[in-house]
C-alpha cells in the first residue's frame, strides 16, 4: 500500500487554493477541440467537496440564461488551469444541495466578512 500512497502524493497539485462550500469560484478549464486547445472559465458557487487525496472532487453550480448548470471537477485534475476564489460564502453546511430548489433572492449566499483589524 505504501507504493500507491507515494504515487498518489506525486499526483497531488500544490497550487489549489483553500475553498469550501458556498465560496464563489472561477475555474479555468482547458478545453480541447480537435487539434486546438483553449481555456474556458466556469464561474459559480461550490455546492460541496467530496473525497480525499487524488480522488477529491468539488461541484460548482451556476445559473446560465435561467437554467441551472452544475459541473463536477476533480481537484487535482490536469485539465484545470487554475482555480480563483472570487468571494467567500457565509454558510453553515458542508453540502448545499438545498440550493438547487431555491429561486431568485432566496438562492443568494451571504458574503463572509473578514474580521481583520482595520488600519488607522
From Swiss-Prot:
GO terms for cellular component: cytosolic large ribosomal subunit. Keywords: Ribonucleoprotein, Ribosomal protein. GO terms for biological process: translation. Transmembrane segments: none annotated. SUPFAM superfamilies: Translation proteins SH3-like domain. One of its GO terms (molecular function) is structural constituent of ribosome. Disulfide bonds: none annotated. Pfam families: Ribosomal_L19. It comes from the Bacteria. InterPro entries: Ribosomal_bL19, Ribosomal_bL19_CS, Ribosomal_bL19_sf, Translation_prot_SH3-like_sf. Belongs to the bacterial ribosomal protein bL19 family. This protein is located at the 30S-50S ribosomal subunit interface and may play a role in the structure and function of the aminoacyl-tRNA binding site. This is Large ribosomal subunit protein bL19. The lineage of its organism: Bacteria, Bacillati, Actinomycetota, Actinomycetes, Micrococcales. The gene is rplS.
